[in-house]
Amino acid sequence: MPWQNSSILRECDMATYANVLIKTPLGVKAEYTYKVDSDLEDKIKFGERAEVLFRGKKTVALVAGISHEEPSFETKSILRILDDNPIITPELYSLAEWVSSYYVSSFSEVLYSLISFKNAKFSRVYEFKDSVQQENITLTQEQDNAIRRIRTSMDEHKTESYYLWGVTGSGKTEVYFAAMEKMISQNKSVIYLVPEIGLTHQLIEKLTARFDKTRIAVLHSALTDSQRLGEWKRIISGEVDIVIGARSAVFAPLSNLGLIIMDEEHDSSYKSDSFVRYHARTIAYKRCQTNNAFIILGSATPSIECYKAFKENKLCLLRLTKRACPMARESEIEIVSAFRSATVISPRLMDALKETLDEKKQAILFLNKRGFLHRLECPECGWIAMCPHCAVPLTYHKNTNKLICHHCHSEYPAITHCKNCYAETTTFRSYGTELVEEEVKALFPYARVSRLDRDVTSKGKNVFETISRDFYDKKTDILIGTQMVAKGLNFPNVSLVGVINAMSGYTMSDFRADEKLFDLIEQVAGRGGRFLEKSKVIVQTDDISSAPLLAVKNRDINGFLDNVSAMRQTLSLPPFVHFARIALRSKKEEKASDAISKIKNYIMDLYQNMLNTNKDKIPQMNIVAYGKCSIEKLNDEYRYHLVLSSKKVKLLSFLISETIKNLTPIYGVRLESDIDPDDLL
């Protein structure tokens, strides 16, 4: 262990020193030694935050070790201790070491990603609203069977990994709650993960109606630093049985962890795109293995990774094939061609919207693009309005009358003529939710219409909750939105779901494109008819022969997953192999190009030397991609990458780690590594 008992050390009449970790990038020294003055010797403990002077600035550091061994160099003194008790447990410290090794990340960055409140000087407790009254629930036979199976394993202390595959509206939450009750009755604690922060609002209402709200904590990035610190301290002190949150909640410092629930496990939001590119599912598996805890993953659209796992009996599959509400029926699904359509809302969808409003029901319209119009193009010469800082087209936002880049967020005045040939007419090739809202309001001026996308929710605190609550309370007739409306929300009065342009955002260069499209359309379709006998889903698309869309229409999820799985296996794609990616960014394209070439050559030489030494024991490794990224430039930085594949992830982690350790960094080039990347864009 990297720490010692400070009380034992203080019994000796010797100076005390602390090794502290300061957040630094991979390959840069992170551990430094500071003297502990006598007035702090009784306070300092492993896992506490300390304030130190580092390179002339007051910096927050994490105490990683305490000793009496006097260093051979002059040391500065710790300025003060920020915590009364440790905020990192031995388990989390060991977990951070594993994450650092697996994902080839800086150990200090991993630790500091756990305590993102590192600069908070005081703590506040998250305040729950008054609980709603618990509804009387009548279980379906399938729910009852699933609950009995899980509870039997828990009673017999036979740790299992479960996959709850249930159609949308089948009552997966009730199965989760029953498992949680059993765990808490055994004095165990629970982590409940959801993919989006917005989904915590509805879930918290249900949780506080069922469980003691004083024993529930919330962890997600929308909390202030002081709120997050307050919740973290409650958890680590043993005051909490249930932690609910988005992906970072998987690191909650619960003692006696007994169960991790991962709802909507297919969702790509569980993969971090920050400094430490972890997947919450991988971390959940590791924590359950360490703590001998149960895991329940659930979705209506299993990821190919989990589909492969329960096909190979590595996960115990539980099925919910029917909706929980007795009167609810499967929605009728129509696919409507929108090829070269002159209007955003097709005549078929327009008629369905009118019928829905006449029947006093509600509708959800989904489009996976925000903004008003996309891809401003000159019909005369083909010029496209591109972001000068990124290799992507600009998006027109009518409410601000500006062209905006959705990557670097640069804004430019709207233009009325081509900047290449000066033609006075320009056209847009696609559109966003803002235009859909305008057209719907023009078609149905009497309807109450709301929009839910990042442009709207970024305007203030609790905007998401307010809009979704108004829709739930039937104060809104039509809700227009991006992926925010597709995930996990439960609206009882929705009888129509319209998908405006199903292929929007579909990227052929993404090997997961078909899977993501299927998941998205199936999930958004599931928002309708959850408590109604009759409901419709109308999918507008440029490609009516799309395999994912036909699978949704024909209710052939098994066939679709089998086909995608077989294709991935044939082409040696995840989950049948692991991918590892090194991505470089530089303002000088030549530097990025030269650096990726050096990295590729070093890795190939290293791998060849390993083969020459012990060929029979070294797994196969291949280069999947090399050169410019699909999006060649972002934020004025040119992007190059190298993608490796192997069935053994440890080999990939080792090759990248050794490369970063031994190659001299190139000034002006930033390196990012990613194990099991979600995409290769």
Predicted feature descriptions by range:
Residues 158-241, 245-593, 641-642, 650:
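Inter-lobe coupling/hinge segments of SF2-like helicase ATPases
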Residues 567-652:
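Long, largely alpha-helical accessory region at the distal end of helicase-like NTP-driven motors
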Residues 13-17, 29, 464, 534, ...:
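A general secondary-structure signal for short beta-strands and their flanking turns/coil
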Residues 105-109, 362, 446-449, 530, ...:
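Intrinsically disordered or highly flexible coil/loop and linker segments, enriched in small
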Residues 364, 393, 448, 620-622, ...:
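Residues at or immediately flanking beta-strands
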Residues 440, 471, 524-528, 603-611, ...:
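Hydrophobic, Leu/Ile/Phe/Ala-enriched alpha-helical segments that form helix-helix packing faces
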Residues 22, 65-67, 115, 367-369, ...:
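A general secondary-structure junction signal
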Residues 1-299, 306, 311-327, 618-620, ...:
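Accessory, non-ATPase domains that flank or precede helicase/AAA+ motor cores in DNA-metabolism machines
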